[in-house]
């Protein structure tokens, strides 16, 4: 399908909804072999899987955006070299979620961690 369109494609790993896991090696191969696949969002909840996406796509001859799909993994994704996250809770707390990215990019790791921690606290209010 990706080869049939002239649009950038981001792969989406959400095994809880699909029943299938998009393996890191598969993400690497698809990003390598299909020009317009430009990234992947990992909502598996498996930090090691997210890290493997980042590590394996870093080996490619093109820039690939790896995004955390779990709100609690945004800062980890950034620290590992990923592009950030697409967070569901950003719809409710956009400033707090954006602050994780903004602080990280500014070199303020304490501020980024505080914002990441705030998301975890806010999440607890909805359980």
PLM features per residue range, with description:
Residues 2-7, 17-127:
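Catalytic alpha/beta core domains of metabolic enzymes, predominantly
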Residues 13-14:
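Conserved C-terminal portion of the radical SAM core fold
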